[in-house]
Amino acid sequence: MIDKVSVQECAICGACINACPVDAISLDKVHLDFRYPQINEDICIHCNRCEKACPILGNKGKPDEGYPVAFAAKSENDPMRMRSSSGGVFYELADQMLRDGGYVCGAVFDDKFHVKHILSNAKEDILRMMDSKYAQSDVGYCYREVKDVLEKGCKVLFSGCPCQVAGLRTFLGKEYPNLVLVELICHGIPSDHMLQTYIGMQERKYGARLTRMEFRNKKKGWHNSSVRMEFANGKVHSEPMTFDTYMQGYFRGVTLKESCFSCQFRAFKSGSDLTIGDLWGAEISIPDMDDNNGLSAVIVNSEKGTLFLNRSEIVRRQFEIDKILKYNQSLLTSFDEGAQRAAFYAYTERCDLERAIETFFQETLLQKAKRKFRFFLRYAWYTLQGKGKPLY
């Protein structure tokens, strides 16, 4: 049974839940603020399909020979690029799959701002899949749905965190030529409960229900992305993402899932065909492509990935992978689990989660001093490059 995997190892990818033929596994085991798979012993038939599907217990993927190959990339569709978190690459890949008559599986917000994966061939759902969502996504039974349409001969593009890509691979148990796997560059994942708690705090602060949320609004530019929350009474919360209370917990690594600190799927071990994310450092390493509207890093890990990328309408330029790794170290290494995380969760046992968020994630004087120093350096750089003043 899947109980061979501890909560310290489990990525909550959902492969075991999808693999169980009698639906004996559900996300009912609570550890800290995450929900983990739990087996109903009264239903379990001990077939061990959950173990066979588990990416923690299974073989890890690796790039094809001659890969990975890296690119700086962006969409030429400027409205879609501005709507995206970085360079609009996911939109272009998903749009290509729709033009091929296929399906796309990716993460969306539902009407209560829970993050979940859906499988769809509708353009409006692709738009919902765009934008970063910094919370654990519930894949539900999407892996089963993906397998069903693959077996019918349909094409599918699956997008998710490396652990979710690995989970789908091991659930399927074989390669499908009609499946394109796209992993996101991943720092780690906070829980749905953490996000819902933060949303509740903000709704009380602004006195109305949340109607729209963007973690990476680019109204002030890609390099000045902000968390934007719109409420039913017309009020708006907009704050630089590096200052936002929720994102403070994320960036410090305090609110991440336990397995993220020893992730087994970094260094291209998920088995993805493509890896996508922000091309941080672009203003230094490739300034002629950086217009502050968003630029993506695309890393190709397979021949299938190359063929699909070549058919998409993505503007790209081959780029040194070492320069991507310099500013995206989470591609190779996990975040260190520091003492503050233990202190935070110990505090939640004495008080509630809201009080812990307020206490731990407000900007300190030292952090403010560091921020102002970084702003000074950025101001000097932008001035020398003639790019104008950064906003923060």
What are these language model-derived features?
Residues 2-3, 9, 15-38, 48-66, ...:
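Iron-sulfur cluster-binding cysteine motifs and their immediate structural context
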Residues 169-180, 199-204:
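Short, surface-exposed basic-aromatic patches at helix termini and helix-loop junctions that form
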Residues 100-103, 203, 208-392:
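Long, compositionally biased charged/polar accessory segments in the mid-to-C-terminal portions
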Residues 8-23, 45-57, 161-167, 256-268:
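Local cysteine-cluster metal-coordination motifs and their immediate loop/turn environment
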